[in-house]
C-alpha cells in the first residue's frame, strides 16, 4: 500500500532484522522509523545543507577556507563512519549497518547545530562557506552509504547534488564536491506519515484477520 515509499519499507524491515534479539514488523514501527529517523534525522540534514547552500551561495558548493577544530573533528568522523558500515555489511549485520548510516546523518545534523552557520552568515560568510562545504561532503557520502539500504533515496541525493553516483572506494572522502560545483534542485527526501494513514492500514489488517477466522 506504499508503492511510493519502497525505501521506507526497506529501512523498516532492515532495522527489524533479528540479529541479537527477536523483532517483528508493525505499522506503528514503520511510521516511527519514517518520521523519527528518515524524516527527522537523514532527510532533515540533507534538506538543511542544501537549502542553506541555495540561500547563501546561489546553489553552488562554496569554497572551503581554513578548518577549525570542530571541522577537523567532523572530518575525522566522516573518514571512519563509512568503513564501519562496510564492515557491518560484510558481517551481514544489517541492523548495525543501518544504524551506522544514521550515525553519519547524525554527524551532519550535530555539525550544523554546533557551528550554526545561519548565525555566522552576516559576520563571516567565508566561515559559513567552509561549514557548508564540509556539510555537503557529508551529504555526498550519504549518497554512497545509503545505496545498499535506500537505493532510490541515494539516487535522489545524487540528483539533488547534481553528482554522478560515487563508489564505496570514495566513501569517507571530504573532496567529493569541488568548490563552485552547481547543485541540482533540492526537495524533501522523505515525508512524514500521519496517524490517519497508519490507522487505515491497521483497519485493513483487522478486516483481513476477521475474514480469515
Regions found by a protein language model. Name each.
Residues 1-4, 30-41, 70-78, 90-100, ...:
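Secondary-structure capping and boundary motifs in well-ordered enzyme cores
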Residues 1-72, 163-189, 193:
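Catalytic adenosine-cofactor/nucleotide-binding cores of aminoacyl-tRNA synthetases and other
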Residues 13-16, 20, 52-64, 70-128:
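Active-site-proximal binding-pocket segments
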Residues 23, 87, 92-93, 102-213:
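Basic, alpha-helical terminal appendages of large translation-related enzymes
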Amino acid at each position: 500500500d506504499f508503492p511510493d515509499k519502497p525505501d521506507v519499507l526497506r529501512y523498516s524491515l532492515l532495522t527489524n532484522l533479528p540479529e541479537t534479539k527477536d523483532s517483528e514488523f508493525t505499522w506503528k514501527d514503520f511510521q516511527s522509523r519514517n518520521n523519527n529517523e528518515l524524516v527527522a534525522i537523514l532527510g532533515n540534514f540533507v534538506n538543511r545543507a542544501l537549502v542553506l547552500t541555495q540561500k547563501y551561495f546561489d546553489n553552488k558548493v562554496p569554497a572551503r577556507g581554513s578548518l577549525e577544530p570542530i571541522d577537523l573533528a567532523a572530518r575525522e568522523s566522516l573518514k571512519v563512519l563509512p568503513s564501519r558500515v562496510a564492515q557491518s555489511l560484510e558481517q551481514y549485520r544489517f541492523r548495525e549497518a543501518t544504524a551506522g548510516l544514521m550515525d553519519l546523518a547524525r554527524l551532519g545534523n550535530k555539525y550544523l547545530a554546533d557551528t550554526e552557520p545561519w548565525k555566522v552568515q552576516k559576520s563571516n560568510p567565508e566561515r559559513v562557506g567552509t561549514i557548508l562545504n564540509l556539510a555537503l561532503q557529508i551529504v555526498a557520502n550519504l549518497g554512497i552509504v545509503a545505496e545498499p539500504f535506500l537505493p532510490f533515496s541515494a539516487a535522489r541525493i545524487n540528483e539533488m547534488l547534481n553528482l554522478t553516483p560515487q563508489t564505496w572506494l570514495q566513501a569517507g572522502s571530504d573532496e567529493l564536491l569541488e568548490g563552485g560545483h552547481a547543485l541540482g534542485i533540492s526537495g524533501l527526501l522523505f515525508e512524514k506519515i500521519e496517524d490517519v494513514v497508519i490507522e487505515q492500514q491497521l483497519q485493513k489488517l483487522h478486516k483481513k484477520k476477521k475474514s480469515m477466522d
